[in-house]
Amino acid sequence: MSNITMKELLEAGVHFGHQTKRWNPKMKPYIFGARNGIYIIDLQKTVRLFKNAYSFVTDAAQAGETVLFVGTKKQAQDSVAEEAQRCGQFYVNDRWLGGMLTNFSTVKQSIDRLKRLDAMIADGTIEAYTKKEQLKLAKEREKLEKTLGGIKGMGKVPGVLFVVDPKNEEIAVSEAKKLGIPVVAIVDTNCDPDDINYVIPGNDDAIRAIRLLTSKMADAVLEGGQARNARLQTGAEEEFSTEGEEVVEETPAEA
């Protein structure tokens, strides 16, 4: 299991919350105090709750669940895309389309359209169109790629949502709640933690803080995936071994 240390959290600035005038009282249990008008997050609680979230994500990945990384604010976009790709999962880092989860069948039609446009470019069939039509199709593809590129390979709604800043991603959190999809989130002092299944109290504005926590969640996915692959491999080997055994018929000894 990947550990997170107090030193790592401090160096990344995970303990810095929002200004005291911009806070959600529901975050009080996770706040250590205030300094120069800024709330300081209790990192001992962050460490404990992070471990809970890490274990949950590891178990989910081991069970074969997919994880959707969500972070559309500028500070989160790169980390969310890079870490989701590193662990072979999906992401939304540009704009959350309403109904992305609750109306996934319609969203999937747009994903299929994006795949068709990709195929047309790859196999050269787009060359059959006029230059003007090609330009129009290219712009359509670019727009779809920007919004849906991170979920292009997602065939169904995910098993888990990992969210950077649930206040900013309230529509995504709301849709997940409606569908009963567990939400793991980096929750700052201005957020409402009530709809989050696994709260990780922390700074959701600093790039280093976001990168640290997001990369650790990607590690959890990788760890769970490795355990799943090892289990499946062992099962396959045992099955092969059983199938390969010769059945030797016993013959009675001659008197």
Swiss-Prot record:
Gene3D superfamilies: Glucose-6-phosphate isomerase like protein, domain 1, Helix hairpin bin
GO biological process, alphabetically ordered: translation
Alphabetical list of PROSITE patterns matching this protein: RIBOSOMAL_S2_1, RIBOSOMAL_S2_2
One Pfam entry name: Ribosomal_S2
Cellular component, GO annotation: cytosolic small ribosomal subunit
Region span, Disordered: 231-255
GO molecular function term, any single one: structural constituent of ribosome
Keywords: Ribonucleoprotein, Ribosomal protein
Skewed-composition ranges (Acidic residues): 236-255
The family this protein is said to belong to: Belongs to the universal ribosomal protein uS2 family.
HAMAP family for this protein: Ribosomal_uS2_B
The protein's name in its UniProt record: Small ribosomal subunit protein uS2
Organism: Geobacter sp. (strain M21)
